[in-house]
Amino acid sequence: QFETGNRFTDEDAKAAYYKTISDGKISDLIPHARYDKASGLFNLDLKAKVHDQLSGGMGGFISSTSSNQICIGAHYRTVSLNSLDVDLTGQIGQSYTSGILSARFDLKTAIPMYLKMQAVASKQKFYQNETLFYSDRMPSFVTQSEQYVKLRLGLPFLTSSKAVVSVGYGSMTDKYYQSNTVDFSTNEQDRSLYDLFVASMKFDRNNLDSYMYPTAGTDCSVLGLLAYGKERFRPYDTTLQSNSTQTLSWLQLEGNIHTYLPISNKFVLGLRGKAVVSSKGLLSNYTSTIAQAPAFTPTPHSQTIFNPAFRSTQYLAAGVIPIWKIMNNLQFRNEFYLFAPFRQIYEGPNY
C-alpha cells in the first residue's frame, strides 16, 4: 500500500499501483512524480477517483432457442483498509434462473488477502431437442437445481497469480427421464438428490483482455477438490426401480490453459486445453451419472445444452481459435475442439 514519506523503487511503485487498482474500488489512479532537489529523490503525488459506493446494472440477450436471459445486479462497496463489497445478482431465463448474494472483506494483513462469503440458488433446464424458436410446451429432459453456501479465502501467489481456498456445503436435485422415448404426457421424472460438502484449492492467473471473446492474454488455472456427501435416488415408478441411498466421496483435479498468440496485426491464434481427473464413481443410473459428470463447455452455446458426448469424469480436451481482427470492436473467429475421455461412461440397462 502507498504511505506518505515511504521510499521505494520504480518496481515497488509499479507493483503497488496495480495492487491498488486491482480490487475495483478505484476507477482511476493518476501518479505524478515531482523531483526534490534537496534530497535528490522524487515525490510521488497520487490523484485517485473512487467508484460510487452503490451501483447497479441490467443486461440480457435474446436467442432463437431457449437461452433468452435477463440479468439484474446491484453492488455496494466501502473504501477502507478493511473494506466491504456486497453483490446481489439475479438471472431470469427460460432455461436458467439464479440468485447470488456475496460479501467480500479485504483484510488488513501483512499479506493482502480477502474473505468472501457466497450464497447461491440456481435452476437450469436442458431440453431433449432445441427448436428454431422456443416452445414452452416442450418439457425439459434434465432439470438441475442447486443451493449452496461457500466461504473463500484469497491471497496472492507468486507475482501475478492468486490462490483461493474454499469450503462449501450445498444440496442439489436432478430431475430427469431415463429414456428419450418416454411419453412425457403420462410419465413424471425420476429424481436424484445430493447433499455435499466440498473443500477446494485453486491457483489462477488471468490477464485476458475480455471475458467473452478475448484476443490477447492468458488464463491458466489448477484446481483440486475433495467432496463428501450422499445421493438419494427417488424413481417415479417404484415397481421398476426402488429407492436407494449411497455415500459419495471423491477427489478431483483440473488443469486449464487458455492463451492467445499474435500472428500479425490482424490475425491471432488462440489455444485452449483442459484436463480433468476424478475418482468419482458411478451413481444410481446412467442418466444421473452423466448429468453429474464434469462437462467440457468451451462456448456459450455449449453451456446451455446437455450433450453426453462431452461429459466424463476423466478427459482431455484441446482446441484452436483462429481470429481475424477486422477492427477494434469487430472480429471473425472460429473455434475447433477435440474431446478425448480417458474414462468413458457407457449407457446400459437402467433397471
Where are the regions that the model predicts?
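Gram-negative/organellar outer-membrane beta-barrel architecture
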Residues: 6-212, 220, 291-300, 305-318, ...
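Acidic/histidine-rich, surface-exposed loop or edge segments in extracytoplasmic proteins
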Residues: 2-3
